[in-house]
């Protein structure tokens, strides 16, 4: 028989079918084509077997490939109906009773609910039910005949399946299966809010399928049968005899420990304790059975949350320090903004628990990004920043260093110390961050999560602690998010989420321990939602009663977490009231001594707050001396040929024909001692790799290049994911080269690269925008971190931003990298001409906040990249990179301007006919970037080569006053013009105009 015809199995099924099959295989009979029912009456000419109207041809699970299994089930059922699953039992009973196609099969309690039933789905595997035939919902009309246990045809109705199941398994066990769903939805009814006025999920309604005490009895007219069964089961549960019955525990739970069976009452008590107490855990969305079972074991194992008395005393001591620190600041500086941690003091013991456990598991360095709330407390009690340095920030003292500094609750620090709990050394860094709360993570929250498992961006597990004070300045959470929890974004990366009540310190410590172990075990993100409150306003002088009167009335009547936990330990006999008082007084004395020392300070030292120190980098270096950037020609040739050659196993590694042409063209350029833009970049990268400098290039499409010019990764044309990276194989002992296509994010990715550049000064870290105008979606990183990071936080960074820029006649989009914005944020005085000296150029670079260049030649691009590493300090470098020049025949450089004794040219002077007779020059055009080639072409077309000089300003900021002055002096009779392709209020004009006047001592005008 044709197997596909199995789907027509019930089209001719009759009540007599199984009986008349005799010795014929039932499964074969089901799937064979057009079965004919033969009986003695049929042979005698009695009318054929009755057929049933049905919207479906057969049950969806019946097909030829399942015939052996169906036969096995059927034979077992014939021997003993109870030996098969209840769903098979009901199916065989219904089919023998003559059920029409689509009605023989009734979904068991473990399958999805039918139309109009409680949408529990996988959340309620024990009680979902109803028939769903061929994915067509059973409507109310179809249910109409299912009134009694058996309909007139003898077909078992939907509820009868459940009742039959309950009879075999026992109603209390059915309830157990239901209640075990606490591990899925128990967090909805967990007691998470320390104030007891809100639900952490913003829903005050408790899911009835979890709370058996909430079930009502009787059946409403619109109640489905599966709901009705729930009511009956709930009623059965209330019988004490059922609650004391002992049940065998399934293998999927750890609540029994060494016990294999427990009374139902104890089962429910343990499940409530594990999932519905002060901890609510979301993890069943994780698509790994191993990881889910790991969390179950950490939550369900009896006694797993018990801790020793010494551990309780440690929690008390840490909580006392956190609370005492805020109280001391409030007493000494009552009117100062400090964004205290009152209401969430448990954050300090929580972070220390994470650090302790992580250190025990082998972690040596921990980097923390956080908002301003609680930052001072973290610096004091987690990092152990000297208290006198913190208290000095409250005094209006002058700075001993250059820079603007920043408010105290934005500052970071770096500490190396011994962890006394594990007796291991640990490096702790709190990264400075403005009030853009999520920026330091980096990026907006979703971007941070999105980067977590990308190969070139993963940290192999980040522990996210949310200080969830249930309010944002004055905004209610119901107006600030659409999801139930503020942590729901973590679901997209399969990160487990632990919600915990901050007024239960021991539960918080348990969750933190699990989080550290999870990260160490699975190298994945994990989230701790610390549900707390904010005892004061947004800051200490803000009045919260204006907007949250009910909440703050409750807060005023809520004792601090320290008082609650102290009382608990006193009641347990762990500590005495005298011991609690003694711990408080000792820390108070420590604060007073630090306060006395702080009052003796006369200056603030910004360097004390450096979050990313570079050990030994600045030692033994002349701060105003730059190493040469030119290299040997042999090195240029070697790198160029390696970069321009196909993979070594070219016979096996098939590259694209277009790539072959590109490689051939590059090789021809090398033979002629020339480079284009892509070759110049590759030679800069390769030469740094040779010198042991790690190079990292990141951004959207950087492996190929937005304009298909780079091709740093070659792809096999017939083997998926087989690649070759030529710059990784230049020298056997070279530094690593990382080129990575990023996610479609600028904010998060640029922030990541900035952080990467901060960790190691001996690395060239480049971020390239797909188009220059895309940098504006990372504006926060540019404004708050890159342009001002050193002034605010004494932090240097050598990050390079590559921004494709140029008006190519393709419309306004993707044309401008907004050069004017970067120049506007350059920190130099347009009216100040620095004293000229041999170190003039380097001193300018040292004093500026960042460097902005618009190169017009591959050689200058080569040199400026190498100069980033040659400098004895680090500054961000902003490069307006070209688009049309990538393949422009004139935009090429000779090896002669890249070899030894050559360097970056801040200004490229005129070297043509005009330079030979400068007194005859009528006009000098100063310009920057690719517009030079347009001007040069127009000059030649008009025959003005000897009348018009064109000077290129390659480095716009810091402005080359000395060289501009020299160039202008060459042409005393010429009119000075600044030429740019951008509009007057864009580009460089507004920046260079006053600086030209300063360079020329206001003696000549430039227009």
Model-identified regions with their sequence ranges:
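Short helix-loop-beta junction
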Residues: 488-494, 760, 900, 936-951, ...
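Structured mid-domain segments that build the active-site/substrate or prosthetic-cofactor binding neighborhood
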Residues: 496, 501-558, 565-581, 946-949, ...
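Short active-site-adjacent structural elements
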Residues: 706, 775, 810, 888, ...
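C-terminal structured "cap/appendage" subdomains that terminate the fold
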Residues: 964-1007
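Generic long, charged, amphipathic alpha-helical segments
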Residues: 733-739, 932, 937-973
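Long hydrophobic segments that form regular secondary structure
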Residues: 576, 900-951
């Amino acid at each position: 028989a044709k197997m596909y015809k199995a789907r027509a199995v019930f089209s001719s099924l009759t009540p007599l079918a199984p009986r008349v099959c005799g010795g014929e295989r039932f499964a074969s009979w089901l799937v064979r084509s057009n079965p004919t029912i033969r009986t003695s009456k049929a042979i005698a000419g009695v009318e054929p077997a009755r057929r049933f109207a049905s919207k479906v041809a057969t049950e969806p699970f019946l097909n030829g490939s399942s015939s052996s299994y169906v036969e096995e089930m059927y034979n077992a059922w014939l021997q003993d109906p109870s030996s098969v699953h209840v769903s098979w039992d009901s199916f065989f009973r219904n089919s023998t009773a003559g059920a029409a196609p689509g009605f023989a099969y009734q979904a068991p309690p473990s399958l999805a609910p039918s139309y109009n039933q409680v949408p529990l789905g996988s959340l309620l595997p024990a009680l979902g039910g109803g028939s769903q035939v061929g994915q067509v919902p059973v409507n109310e009309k179809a249910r109409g005949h299912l009134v009694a246990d058996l309909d007139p045809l003898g077909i078992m109705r939907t509820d009868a399946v459940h009742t039959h199941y309950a009879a075999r398994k026992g109603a209390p066990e059915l309830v157990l299966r239901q209640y075990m769903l606490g591990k899925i939805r128990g967090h909805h009814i967990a007691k998470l809010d320390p104030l007891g006025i809100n639900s952490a999920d913003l829903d005050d309604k408790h899911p009835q399928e979890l709370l058996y005490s909430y079930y009502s009895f009787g059946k409403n007219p619109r109640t489905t049968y599966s709901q009705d069964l729930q009511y009956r089961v709930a009623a059965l549960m209330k019988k004490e005899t059922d609650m004391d019955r002992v049940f065998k525990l399934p293998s999927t739970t750890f609540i029994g420990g060494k016990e294999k069976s427990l009374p139902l009452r104890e089962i429910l008590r343990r499940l409530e304790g594990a999932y519905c107490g002060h901890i609510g855990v979301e993890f069943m969305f994780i698509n790994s059975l191993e990881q889910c079972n790991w969390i179950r074991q950490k939550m369900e194992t009896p006694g797993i949350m018990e801790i020793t008395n010494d551990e309780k005393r440690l929690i008390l001591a840490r909580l006392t320090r956190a609370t005492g620190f805020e109280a001391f600041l409030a007493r000494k500086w009552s009117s100062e903004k400090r964004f205290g941690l009152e209401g969430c003091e448990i954050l300090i013991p929580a972070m220390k628990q994470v650090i302790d456990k992580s250190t025990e598991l082998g972690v040596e360095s921990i980097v923390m990004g956080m908002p301003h709330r609680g930052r001072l407390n973290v610096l004091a009690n987690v990092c152990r920043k000297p208290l006198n340095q913190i208290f000095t920030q409250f005094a209006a003292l002058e700075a001993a260093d250059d820079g603007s500094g920043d408010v105290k609750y934005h500052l970071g620090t770096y500490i190396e110390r011994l962890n006394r709990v594990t007796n291991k050394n640990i490096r702790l860094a709190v990264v400075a961050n403005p009030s853009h709360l999520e920026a330091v993570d980096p990026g907006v929250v979703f971007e941070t999560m999105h980067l977590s498992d990308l190969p070139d961006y993963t940290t192999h597990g980040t522990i996210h602690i949310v200080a969830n004070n249930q309010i944002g300045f004055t905004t209610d959470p119901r107006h600030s998010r659409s999801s139930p929890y503020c942590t729901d974004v973590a679901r997209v990366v399969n990160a487990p989420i632990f919600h915990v009540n901050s007024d239960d310190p021991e539960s918080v410590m348990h969750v933190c321990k699990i989080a550290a172990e999870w990260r160490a075990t699975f190298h994945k993100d994990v989230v701790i939602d610390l549900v707390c409150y904010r005892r004061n306003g947004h800051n200490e002088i803000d009045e919260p009663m204006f907007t949250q009167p009910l909440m703050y009335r409750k807060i005023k009547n809520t004792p601090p977490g320290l008082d609650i936990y102290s009382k608990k330990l006193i009641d347990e006999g762990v500590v005495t009231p005298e011991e609690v008082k003694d711990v408080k007084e000792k820390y108070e004395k420590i604060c007073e001594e630090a306060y006395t020392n702080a009052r003796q300070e006369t200056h603030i030292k910004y360097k004390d707050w450096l979050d990313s120190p570079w050990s030994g980098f600045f030692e033994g270096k002349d701060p105003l001396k730059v190493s040469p950037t030119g290299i040997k020609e042999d090195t240029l040739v070697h790198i160029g040929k390696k970069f321009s050659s196909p993979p070594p196993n070219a016979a096996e590694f098939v590259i694209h024909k277009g790539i072959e042409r590109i490689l051939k063209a590059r090789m021809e350029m090398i033979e002629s001692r020339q480079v284009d833009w892509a070759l110049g970049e590759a030679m800069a990268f390769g030469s740094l790799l040779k010198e042991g400098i790690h190079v990292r290039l990141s951004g959207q499409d950087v492996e190929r290049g937005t304009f298909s010019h780079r091709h740093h990764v070659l792809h096999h044309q017939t083997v998926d994911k087989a690649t070759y990276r030529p710059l990784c194989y230049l020298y056997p002992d070279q530094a690593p080269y990382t080129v990575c296509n990023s996610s479609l994010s600028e904010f998060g990715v640029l922030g990541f690269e900035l952080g990467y550049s901060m960790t190691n000064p001996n690395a060239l870290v480049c971020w390239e925008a797909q188009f220059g105008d895309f940098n504006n979606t990372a504006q926060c990183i540019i404004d708050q971190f890159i342009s001002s990071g050193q002034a605010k936080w004494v932090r240097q960074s050598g990050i390079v931003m590559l921004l494709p820029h140029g008006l190519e006649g393709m419309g306004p989009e993707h044309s401008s990298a907004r050069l004017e914005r970067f120049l506007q944020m350059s920190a130099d005085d347009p009216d100040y001409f620095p004293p000229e000296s041999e170190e003039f150029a380097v001193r300018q670079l040292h004093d500026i906040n960042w460097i902005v260049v618009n190169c017009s030649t591959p050689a200058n691009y080569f040199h400026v990249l190498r100069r980033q590493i040659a400098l004895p300090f680090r500054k961000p470098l902003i490069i307006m990179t070209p688009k049309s020049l990538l393949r422009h025949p004139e935009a090429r450089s000779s090896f002669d301007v890249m070899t030894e004794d050559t360097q970056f040219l801040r200004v490229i002077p005129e070297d043509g006919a005009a330079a030979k007779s400068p007194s005859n020059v009528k006009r000098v055009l100063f310009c920057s970037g690719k517009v030079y080639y347009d001007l040069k072409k127009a000059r030649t077309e008009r025959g003005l080569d000897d009348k018009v000089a064109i000077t290129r300003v390659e480095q716009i900021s810091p402005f080359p006053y000395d060289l501009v002055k020299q160039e202008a002096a060459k042409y005393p009779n010429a009119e000075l013009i600044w030429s740019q392709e951008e509009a007057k209020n864009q580009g460089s004009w507004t920046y260079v105009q006053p600086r030209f006047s300063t360079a020329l001592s206001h003696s000549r005008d430039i227009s």
